[in-house]
Amino acid sequence: MPGLTPPDRFCSATFRTFEPRSASQADALDAARRFVEAYRRVPSLTERVGRWLGWGPSRPEGLYLLGPAGTGKTHLLAAMYHALTPEVPCAFLHSSTLFRQTKPPDAFARQLAESYAVCCLDEVEIDDPANEMRLVQWMKTLSDEGVALLGTSNVDPERSLVTHVSGGRVHRFLQTAFRDRYRIVIVEGDDFRRTDAVERTGHVWVAPPARTRPLLERARAEGVEVFAD
């Protein structure tokens, strides 16, 4: 399945380029690094035998970055993707890609498992019980197939929609199995997008290209960061 990579604005996101502005962001950065280190670590013979017998440490199943918008969650998700690839095949997709699928969620998960060892799911926001149940089925199938999941969301899985409409397996998964399988890391802080916008000052030119081009070239020559649309 081609094209399952981070968006262009995060194509060069790394742990080094992430600048924590709060204690929880620093903790999230550390958790992301530790996940990559643990996943890439080559187990000893004893550990491999232990995994085969069902005891001893196993590879981490996933990491779930939870917090408000603009706190760097997607940057960290993309940084983990880049730190793992190409040695570890990873898929990166927005939650809307999952919900637009016409095939059953378990079939889509198995299709991903054929090519990828880690799946990065960005911006999990659920406003529909049907989509939430699709998400749970997809996640359970990925786990059963041995695919690790890295996710970002503004929504605590324990405060989900189906909590109020279902008392069955979906509810139990979100309340218990989710925390057993995935480490949840809180990422708090000011909205990067708003603080960066305040810190960046400059000029805006609105005119035909022939008139704005000389102004843009002059600004570039003066070392000003230029965005042209």
Predicted regions and their residues:
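A short, basic N-terminal segment
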Residues: 1-55
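Walker A (P-loop) phosphate-binding loop of P-loop NTPases
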Residues: 70
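Hydrophobic anchor at the beta1->P-loop junction of P-loop NTPases
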Residues: 65
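Short glycine-rich substrate-engagement loop in P-loop NTPases that contacts/grips substrate
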Residues: 85-116, 129-133
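Conserved helicase/translocase motor-coupling segment
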Residues: 225-229
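Hydrophobic positions on the alpha1 helix immediately C-terminal to the Walker A/P-loop
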Residues: 76, 80
